[in-house]
């Protein structure tokens, strides 16, 4: 395994240490989140009860295949802990997310979370944000939550 992949795996394993029994968690999308899902799956297989709100169909399928129960955002009042990767992050801890095309779902999950942990390898650290292209996305998942939020503003 190359160093970049080892960093992703270590970051994911460190974040997974924050998972506790009976948590509702937000599971992110991407190459670093992949390692988190594997670790959370090992914990679930060992008996930890986790419910997950996922940020993409790919994450949903991977979570289910690793013994993690998946729910919709409408099925919970809050997410105890969301863990996701970032596309870029600067030294002020400002970050860019959503390059994988799951921006809206990522925002919905993060907005329901009591706490969020961002995981990444060192290649994501940049001097200046903006080198990464960002998608704009509108989709049915969580539509009512977004609509209600817009009405409040």
Each model region followed by its residue ranges:
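Conserved phosphate- and dinucleotide-binding cores of soluble alpha/beta proteins
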Residues: 3-6, 57-153
């Amino acid at each position: 395994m190359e160093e970049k992949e080892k960093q992703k795996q270590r970051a994911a394993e460190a974040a997974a240490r924050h998972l506790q029994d009976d948590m509702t968690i937000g599971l992110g999308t991407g190459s670093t989140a992949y390692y988190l899902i594997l670790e959370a799956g090992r914990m679930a297989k060992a008996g930890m009860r986790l419910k997950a709100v996922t940020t993409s169909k790919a994450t949903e399928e991977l979570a289910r295949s690793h013994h993690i129960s998946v729910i919709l955002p409408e099925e919970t009042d809050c997410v105890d802990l969301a863990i996701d990767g970032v596309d870029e992050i600067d030294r002020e801890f400002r970050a860019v997310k959503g390059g994988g095309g799951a921006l809206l779902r990522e925002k919905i999950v993060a907005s329901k979370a009591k706490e969020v942990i961002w995981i990444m390898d060192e290649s994501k650290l940049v001097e200046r944000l903006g080198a990464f292209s960002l998608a704009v996305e509108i989709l049915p998942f969580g539509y009512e939550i977004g609509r209600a939020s817009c009405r409040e503003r």
